[in-house]
Amino acid sequence: MVADVKSPAGLAAFNTTLAEQAFATGFVLSGEDAQLFAALGSAPNASTYPNVARWYANVASYTDAERKTWASAGGSAPAAAAADGDDFDLFGSDDEEEDAEKAKIVEERLAAYAEKKAKKAGPIAKSSVILDVKPWDDETDLGEMEKLVRSIEMDGLVWGGAKLIPIGYGIKKLQIITVIEDLKVSVDDLIEKITGDFEDHVQSVDIVAFNKI
């Protein structure tokens, strides 16, 4: 993990790290991502640090409350804050004398508690996906192929780092990371769009890894 993202050298090192993985410690969001996000403060220059810029946009899509729940690498998520109001006394004061009155108070407070919990929006389900995009032959312009893949824009889709990997006979494949919101983006639809829209460049697309975040 990069300790100092405020220096150009540290930011460049983090950009290199994100070319190989989606997040600070791998392919799952962690407390380190939240710390680096806070330390960075604002999105970096996308031309100079494209991988960090994409990572920043993804982390920024979460709320502060959600980022506080991310566990540090090898650790556990922090306990929920008491400020949520979940710790109020359901059973009222010890000075209550009538059982009926106590029961009424408990019932009212339980109803209010249940209503409050029901109104809380749950965390957005996201997944980190690594795709192998294979060209037809060694004459395919892989730079152009990557640009075409990244040109696909969907609500809930964020492209991450990418690299070229030799597969034999002078042919290389494009391996690219993407983070998707599960309710908004279908990986099958994304693959179909890549192979359908860019069939002159793309022979096939395979899923290398699929991890829930």
Curated annotation (Swiss-Prot):
<protein>
    <recommendedName>
        <fullName>Probable elongation factor 1-beta/1-delta 1</fullName>
    </recommendedName>
</protein>
<comment type="function">
    <text>EF-1-beta and EF-1-delta stimulate the exchange of GDP bound to EF-1-alpha to GTP.</text>
</comment>
<comment type="similarity">
    <text>Belongs to the EF-1-beta/EF-1-delta family.</text>
</comment>
<dbReference type="GO" id="GO:0003746">
    <property type="term" value="F:translation elongation factor activity"/>
</dbReference>
<dbReference type="InterPro" id="IPR049720">
    <property type="entry name" value="EF1B_bsu/dsu"/>
</dbReference>
<dbReference type="InterPro" id="IPR001326">
    <property type="entry name" value="Transl_elong_EF1B_B/D_CS"/>
</dbReference>
<dbReference type="InterPro" id="IPR036282">
    <property type="entry name" value="Glutathione-S-Trfase_C_sf"/>
</dbReference>
<dbReference type="GO" id="GO:0005829">
    <property type="term" value="C:cytosol"/>
</dbReference>
<keyword id="KW-0251">Elongation factor</keyword>
<dbReference type="InterPro" id="IPR018940">
    <property type="entry name" value="EF-1_beta_acid_region_euk"/>
</dbReference>
<dbReference type="Pfam" id="PF10587">
    <property type="entry name" value="EF-1_beta_acid"/>
</dbReference>
<dbReference type="GO" id="GO:0005085">
    <property type="term" value="F:guanyl-nucleotide exchange factor activity"/>
</dbReference>
<dbReference type="InterPro" id="IPR014038">
    <property type="entry name" value="EF1B_bsu/dsu_GNE"/>
</dbReference>
<dbReference type="GO" id="GO:0005853">
    <property type="term" value="C:eukaryotic translation elongation factor 1 complex"/>
</dbReference>
<dbReference type="Pfam" id="PF00736">
    <property type="entry name" value="EF1_GNE"/>
</dbReference>
<dbReference type="GO" id="GO:0006414">
    <property type="term" value="P:translational elongation"/>
</dbReference>
<dbReference type="InterPro" id="IPR014717">
    <property type="entry name" value="Transl_elong_EF1B/ribsomal_bS6"/>
</dbReference>
<keyword id="KW-0648">Protein biosynthesis</keyword>
<dbReference type="InterPro" id="IPR036219">
    <property type="entry name" value="eEF-1beta-like_sf"/>
</dbReference>
<comment type="subunit">
    <text>EF-1 is composed of 4 subunits: alpha, beta, delta, and gamma.</text>
</comment>
